[in-house]
Amino acid sequence: MFKHILFPTDGAMTSKHIISECIGFAKDAGAIVTALHVMPRYSRAYDEEGAQAFRRECVSAAEEFLEEINTVARDAGVPCNPLHATSDYPYDAILRIAEEKHCDLIVMASHGRKGVKGMLINSETQKVLTHTKLPVLVFR
């Protein structure tokens, strides 16, 4: 049914717990996974040295998050393409990458919490749900 899953992550603990869920779903579907981490742009207010240091730190963190997903996928025998992008609007980058990579499903974390906050959905997840034409599977 699904052949190419986009799995965007911000590396937060709330999205880390769904890595195995996403990879398991992909394995059952016989799908490949594109793991995506969207990094913020660095502000022009930084000096050039600060901007470069910020970018290096963001890339390093992205590669760490993506390697964790890639390791779980490799261990499960699921093809995984790690990718990072830069955007001030993560949902926009998610939609763009989903289209560019011809993904047919987006899997995201709800970032739900306990109590009233648990009933709310992450704003980036909500924006993806609102603006995409693709199916979105949201894990809690």
What is the role of each PLM region?
Residues K3-E49, V72-A76:
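Small/aliphatic-rich secondary-structure junction motif
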Residues T14, P90, K114-V116:
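Short glycine-rich, flexible loops that bind phosphorylated cofactors or substrates
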Residues I18, A45-E48, D92-L95, G118-L120:
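Short, well-ordered secondary-structure micro-motifs
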Residues G24, R96-R140:
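Gly/Ser-rich helix-loop-strand patches that form or flank binding pockets
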Residues V33, C80-P82, V136:
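Hydrophobic anchor at the start of a short beta-strand
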Residues L36, L83-A85, F139:
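Structural motif
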Residues Q52-E64:
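A short acidic, glycine-rich active-site loop
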